[in-house]
Amino acid sequence: MLGSVIARPLAERGFQVLIQSTRGTFGSGGVFDPFRFEREDGLATLEWVVKQPWFGAAIVLAGGSYLGYVQWAVADSLPPEVKAIIPQVTESALTLEFLRKDGLTLETPFSWGVMVAGQERRGALLRGMAQVRRNRRALSTLPLGQADVAAIGHHSDYVQDVLAYDADQPRWAGIDHRHRVAQVSVPVCSIGGWYDIFLPGQLRDFLILQEAGRPARLMVGPWTHISADGTALRESIEFGLAHARGEQPPPRPPVRLYVMGEEAWRDFDSWPPGGYLPQRFHLQPDGALASQPPGESASDRYRYDPADPTPAVGGVRMGRGSGRVDNTALEARPDVLTYTTAPLEEDVEVIGEVSAEIWFRSSLPHADVFARLCDVDPRGRSRNVCDGLVSLSGADELICAAVRLWPTAYRFKRGHRIRVQVSSGAFPRYARNPGTGVPHATATRLLPADQEVYHDGAHPSAVILPVRQAQ
């Protein structure tokens, strides 16, 4: 499959393409331990390649997801024959993105762990859709530590490790290559998507390169993890071929972003671009959203029931139905609050990091807050722009929940409205909060919670957007 999807387009343009199986997979010796041996094996592979009689004097490393991560694993020790690297939809500390302290990402690591556990079985690709349905059912298993058994009949070591070990525990030592990023000595072309799971880490890596003065380009398109189009391929080939030949790609500013809403590519000198200032849009009574601070008002309430969890709709997911989608049905649920501006009198352009501060109280000490930014068109259709979740302890006391949403580049057009959703979950993208404080892997009880969102002068809940008024 990789041969036809990745190798053929590159080979047709003059590259010799080498795709390597990870240790312990598809006939490769040793034991498969995801992410563990990629530095050791990657450096050994590069040493072998340059000694081959067919080697043509220049190497470009390219690939997405895991195939991008392995580039960062060797980035600070590249032989001189490597002329450029092109990591796509990836970052230098891959698994750690799933283990963020602000909320356990569930669906992606579970699906990937289940997939690699059976990837060498006969007919694995043909059984893919049936496996997706089994995974969906399995993710509701209690305790969650048995979900992989429900999906594939046995435990997945990777899934068990994700459920059992926090990001700072020794199990993950050696798979974090963030410290290598600033030491890369060759040009980098980093390609990502606004709805990709690894985008925050990918932008962090680019910032490191930028601050270290390394030669680097960034392209971010309107893509999910698996939906990049020919634009990304053309960028890779143009950049890779030029450096392989000892030339420079056509000059342009280092950052190229697809601005959604405007539906156009724009070039910038840096990430985040200059000239965008944080603007607070405050939650108001009666579901309003406005730039002025709120006055006195009562809190809004909803009940979150993990036995009927608020579903993940679109957004940062791996499979079908991800990305920008219609949120009408989601917003009709009683466990989702919405706050919406009046129709905009002029375009509002948002590019950069997005966050929210939600004053919140739950009937239980353990709760989650999910915030989503949406664009509502003149027909009333609400489509998601970016979102994020934070898990709270001590939530039975009034607390300001700081939610880090995904970065974005979006133009809200005149006549449209800006909307913020507030809820307590996006299952199965994020693990549902059982409300008991028991670890996800072992929790067997699910407690419903009554939630309150405050928006008054003393508790000014808001979404903070990096805004430049469009001319």
Language-model segments: residues:
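Short beta-strand/loop motif that positions the catalytic acidic residue
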Residues: 184, 190-192
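Conserved alpha/beta-hydrolase "acid-adjacent" motif
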Residues: 197-203
